[in-house]
């Protein structure tokens, strides 16, 4: 599969992640009387990843997250030469998803970006008022565990066909844990899209939601490769290295 086609798949996947996950947060979380709340938003993010893993996993690997691509590279499962195209596609997809969400949300009288538009933040902009340090630790650890689950469930020794389920459920669990802390990022592209529309504080605090997920993902990739991989496991550049294996 050509790099262009795989990058297009990453764009579409990240678009859906932001529209579906952040859309649930913005449009449905606090809907009068019937709002889905934190649990519903958590499930929405997990479902967007689960559905896209089956839809594009065989095309691009369904990274739809710069931290995932970097973590796979650190684990020697993804070539460095393809990092920039993948990350660019993911960021653009996240921005496009946030743009469509903005158009939809703006169709309701009284809509305002002052509610945060599902942006990530710390301190005063943390949903629960958590400190910068707490938010940093949370994002690093959550992304580390996310990558450990991705790497383990896509390992050639793992049961075939179950990786998308494990990964989707892990993202749901991560959101259940960390929405009150940072509004949950673990994905720089997911954070960038909404932040560009909110501007101001969301842009000023965006650095954390690039730094922490990348650090957590890279540490997980290095750890898994050093301590849990077996000789003969996938190496950089092998065709299967980027894929979430979904075959039975």
Swiss-Prot record:
Classify the main location: membrane
Alphabetical GO CC annotations of the entry are: plasma membrane
* Motif NPA 2 per UniProt: ranges: 187-189
What positions carry the motif NPA 1? Answer: 65-67
Q: PROSITE patterns under this entry? A: MIP
User: What CDD domains does its record include?
Assistant: MIP
Q: Which cysteines are joined by disulfide bonds?
A: none
- This chain belongs to the protein called Aquaporin Z
Where exactly is the site Selectivity filter? 45, 175, 184, 190
Q: What sections of the protein cross the membrane?
A: 11-31, 36-56, 87-107, 132-152, 161-181, 203-223
Name the domain of life this protein comes from.
Answer: Bacteria
What Pfam families would the database entry show?
MIP
By sequence similarity, the record places it as follows: Belongs to the MIP/aquaporin (TC 1.A.8) family.
Q: Which GO terms describe its biological process?
A: water transport
User: How does the record describe its quaternary structure?
Assistant: Homotetramer.
Catalytic activity as recorded in UniProt: H2O(in) = H2O(out)
The feature of type site (Involved in tetramerization or stability of the tetramer) is located at: 22
Q: What is known of its domains?
A: Aquaporins contain two tandem repeats each containing three membrane-spanning domains and a pore-forming loop with the signature motif Asn-Pro-Ala (NPA).
Q: Does the keyword Transport apply?
A: yes
